[in-house]
Amino acid sequence: MPGAEPIRLWDLWPELYDRTETSIIDPHYVHQGAWGAKCIARRSPAEHIDVGSYLPWVAFLTCMTQVVFIDMRPLGEKIEGVRCIAGDLLSLPLKSRSVHSLSCLHVAEHIGLGRYGDGLEPRGTQLAARELSRVLAPGGELLFSVPVGRPRLCFNAHRIHSPGQILRYFADLQLVDFSLVDDSGRFRPNSSPAEAKDAHYACGMFRFRRAALAS
């Protein structure tokens, strides 16, 4: 076409399925990202530690704080404002009761299934929850999300947990609030965990806090 850039056969890159009537999103990741960022912005921590969450979201957090990112697969690229540490969610390289702002979003359901090169561990989510709880400081907050609904294992992709399971796994923490992306993709803030118990594949977002030490 006149005025167009040069075109060669080996530069062709056909995209045939983008002519949709509405924009396509993954509601779990879009809504949990906005939810998590708002929670962190309200607290405005000097440093935030994330374990294995969606990397573009982790990079976005550098707009408001310094971030330590822990993952079993270290980053190959440097991201300004992000310090990367290689680590296993079942054995975090952190001292007990040391972290004041912590997140682990849509991660724990994969632990122990071998999908990412880790060993098999049937109690993967439960042990991950125990480790996250171990490192959370008094007065600290944990943002945690997993697929919720009727509990089952979808090997080797992920697990789906009942909200009650997650509350039991974090029994030594206080649930501050719970939000939900339901099976229709609708975000439902400040919901009751019981509302998700019969879901097929919802996203449960739990904000936990460890009680502050008595003065």
Question: What function would you assign to each model-found segment?
Answer:
Residues 163-213:
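Class I S-adenosyl-L-methionine
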Residues 103, 108, 112:
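A conserved beta-strand element that flanks and buttresses the S-adenosyl-L-methionine
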Residues 89-101, 129-135:
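Short amphipathic alpha-helices and their capping/turn segments at secondary-structure boundaries
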Residues 120-141:
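A short glycine-rich, Lys/Arg-flanked "PGG" loop and its adjoining helix->strand segment in the class I
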Residues 113-118:
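Conserved catalytic-core motifs of eukaryotic protein kinase domains, centered on the activation segment
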